Amino acid sequence: MPAGRRAELLHWAARAPGRRYIIEDDYDSEFRFDTRPLPSLQGMAGADGPVVYLSTCSRSLAPGIRIAYMVLPRPLLGAWQEKYRLYSGTVGRFEQQTLARFITGGYFTRHLARERTAYKARRDALVAALRTSFAPEELTLAGLHTGLHLLAQLKDPPPDAALRAAARQYGVRCALLSDYDLTGTAHSAVGTLVLGYGSLPDADCAAAGERLKKLCTAAREASDTV
């Protein structure tokens, strides 16, 4: 969401103080490459602003930590402390306190900087492999600047069903953008692969481009014979 649109949303919430709150799920915001990170709504609004900020450490650290967190605006914090003062979470206090010290000591910031460098190099290697395996007129890449996945849109694509079958045949774990189209009306989603690279070994990036090319060729040949 552009910064101008974020400001409009905050202005909308501010017109009804105490009655309108924005829930901001800032998933994957830590991983933004090539451009400066956009400010969060919570950061723009300040501690008294109408934003409830949610995030998790499942990507930035590890899913096994099982820790998410919430930043409440001060007008809601007192009510939350009163209502949930006896609440006991499923994560031990030892893990919570360890993470808190990891963050306040500046270690988390340095950890994220190292992760961004590593993931950017991995993304660049995957993009280079795709551009080597596919001609420019065959494939368009999008969503390269943030998150740990990218979109590979095939030009003149075979049916998505053929792509799914070929992916199983070649042992490729990837989603199709149409899997997220609940209405089935987004025609632009057809033939678009969602390629996650967070857990892709660096040494496998080149082979990934070649395998995807074979997958797409097999899907197109299979659809032509039907």
Give the predicted meaning of each segment:
Residues V71, L151-Q153, G196-G198:
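Short hydrophobic/aromatic beta-strand micro-patches
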Residues M1-G18, D28-S60:
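Active-site pre-lysine segment of PLP-dependent enzymes
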Residues Q169, A186-V226:
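PLP-dependent enzyme catalytic core of the Aspartate aminotransferase-like
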Residues A100, R116-V127, L139-Q153, L163-A166:
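Conserved glycine-rich beta-strand-loop-beta hairpin in the small C-terminal domain of fold type I
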Residues A47, D160-R164, C174-D202:
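Active-site-adjacent capping/gating segments
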Residues G43-E82, F94:
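Active-site PLP attachment segment
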Residues Q81-Y84, G105-V127, P157:
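Structural signature of PLP-dependent enzymes
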